[in-house]
Amino acid sequence: MMIWRIAAGYMSTKDKLSRFVDIGDVYCPLCRLEIESSLHLFAFCPVTKAMWFNSKWGLRMDSFGFSSVVDFIQFFCSPPFINQLSQKNELLLFGAILCDGIWKLRNQVIFADLPLRCDELNLEYGSNLWNSNFLDSGLFRL
């Protein structure tokens, strides 16, 4: 569902909200360096780029040349560096789970006024999750 919401443009990021309401601060709540858009938040924010790089694939999101969220989502559906279907599915699932975690972290920073704790997100969604072989546990089916 998260991947679909990003691709369809249904994420309530600050760039979208500011078109209708004067929200004041339009900057990314995680890095405070750029205007918050879906593409920035999920792919180019320095905080989230570190999380992608911490994955077992060592993804450097800025090296893929995404120019839109459609490019970003298409990358997960057809990754250029993976041939086996099971590995493609694993990357897609990882992308969806990490995007969900990024969105939850963003909302905690904005609405719960919690400090940014990247280390916790990396532990929860990063390489440790994938080293546990939870895909083989039968809990998730693609």
Question: Each predicted region: which residue ranges?
Answer:
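Helix/loop segments that flank and initiate small ligand/metal-binding modules
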Residues: 1-35, 101
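Short, conserved non-catalytic motifs in the polymerase core
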Residues: 26-35, 73-88, 113
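Cys/His-coordinated zinc-binding microdomains
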Residues: 32, 46-49
